[in-house]
Structures are given as structure tokens and as C-alpha cells.
Amino acid sequence: MKSIAVYPGSFDPFTNGHLDIIRRAHPLFEEIIIAVAINSKKTSLFSPEERVEMIGKVFHGWDKIKIDTFEGLTVDYCKEKNSRVILRGLRAVTDFDYEYAISLMNKKLAPEIETYFLMADNEYSFVSSTIVKEVARHGRAVSNQVPDVVGEALVKKFSV
């Protein structure tokens, strides 16, 4: 069976922290699906289509990387894609508490699916999509926290 990892998230926007997790996980799997979650109950800065397009540009030319969208439970999406691994990044203890609880529920729902946690590199341990949006909204540079294509999109969004 092909080793496929699903890296789910809203990625609104995609950050260098997300990129670092993918870069480090890339050699470990035959395929990584970056699964952009669609949550109609949340107001997003970027549409799912915009997020997929930006992430696609970030990973242009990379082998083994696919970008997709999904709604519903991550474990159901994993089953649909024949993946037995959910990939998650952890920045701090607060991330661990939240992610651990979700991984336990996922294990109850789908015992065959494992959650793999990668610790954030120190350089990215403070970076979050929420913080990046807030800083960019106030006209400050976020170029060290996001890939270039995302930084350009943020400038366009907030310079209207």
C-alpha cells in the first residue's frame, strides 16, 4: 500500500510554518495531500480556491505533493484517499493539548488511521495564520512568515 499522508488545515493563509512541516515530512511519504478544509461556518480571508491556487504555486515542481479541498471529518477524507496518516504540526503545549484530543477522537472513529506530529522548528514556533493576518491587516510586513506568493496576496487583500 502506498504511504499517503494527509496534511489538513484551513491554511488561511499558508505560512512558512506549514511549508516547514511539509518540507520535513516530504522524504517520509510517497505522497502528501495538503487538504484545505472548507468550513462554511467560518469566515475566511481567502476562498478555498485562492488557498489551493497559492499552495499550488508554493509547491510547483515538487513531486509527491497534491493539493485538494475537503469538507467534513478528516478521517473520512483519509479513508476516501486511502491514507492511514494524518500529519500535524505542533508549535507549543497548547497546540499539543488540542491536537491530542482530536487525535484520540480520530482514533475512536478510525483506529487504522494514525496521527503523526512534527514539532515546529523554533524559527516558526510563533507563526500562525491568525497572527499573520492581523499583522498584515495593519500594514506591517509578514514576508518572513509566509511564502512570497502568499505575502503578495495579503498585500492585495489589505491594500483595497
Curated annotation (Swiss-Prot):
It comes from the Bacteria. Substrate binds at S10, K42, T74, R88. Gene3D superfamilies: HUPs. It is found in: Cytoplasm. GO terms for biological process: coenzyme A biosynthetic process. Its main location: cytoplasm. ATP binds at S10, F11, H18, G89, L90, R91, E99, Y124, S125, F126, V127, S128, S129, T130. Its cofactor is Mg(2+). CDD domains: PPAT (cd02163). InterPro entries: Cyt_trans-like, PPAT, Rossmann-like_a/b/a_fold. One of its GO terms (cellular component) is cytoplasm. Pathway: Cofactor biosynthesis; coenzyme A biosynthesis; CoA from (R)-pantothenate: step 4/5. It is an enzyme of class 2 (transferase). Keywords: ATP-binding, Coenzyme A biosynthesis, Cytoplasm, Magnesium, Nucleotide-binding, Nucleotidyltransferase, Transferase. Homohexamer. This is Phosphopantetheine adenylyltransferase. It comes from Leptospira biflexa serovar Patoc (strain Patoc 1 / ATCC 23582 / Paris). The gene is coaD.
